[in-house]
Amino acid sequence: MTTLFILNDPPYGTERVYNGLRLAANLQRLDEGHDVVVFLMGDAASAAKAGQSVPNDYYNVNKMLGNVLRRDGKVLVCGTCMDARGLAPEDLIDGAQRSTLDELTQERIVFTANADVS
């Protein structure tokens, strides 16, 4: 099974990105072989910027995205959203990939085709 997460909010200031990544990690941990794709759009694109520093004992979305990648998940970042925020591909954490809406559409098609509709 594949689960596609489309995140739009900034990495900090709300907990939507944090909670989406928590759910992604739990799916990967509890269901080996569960494919997870995280697509970062809008302000969420900055979640994949490498080298973020957060206060001690505060969640770090870089580490959370890295955990998704280490478990063979995908992290795709909207290229247009990156451009609007001055992010270059080399600014991203290792494993995150600049992407497009066309790729998101393909991921959605794969997700829909694999969905359990019973």
Task: Give each language-model segment a name.
Residues A84-S118:
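C-terminal structural segments of small proteins and small subunits
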Residues G51-N56, L92-D94:
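Short glycine-enriched, charge-decorated loop/helix-capping segments at active-site entrances
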Residues L4-G20, A48-S53:
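Short, glycine-rich nucleotide/cofactor-binding loops
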Residues T2, H34-V37, K74:
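Residues at the starts of beta-strands that form the adenosine-phosphate
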Residues D9-P11, G42-S46, C81-A84:
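Acidic, glycine-rich active-site loops and adjacent beta-strand->loop/helix elements
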Residues V17-L30, V38:
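Histidine-anchored nucleotide/phosphate-binding helix
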Residues V54-D83:
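A glycine-rich helix N-cap at a beta->alpha junction
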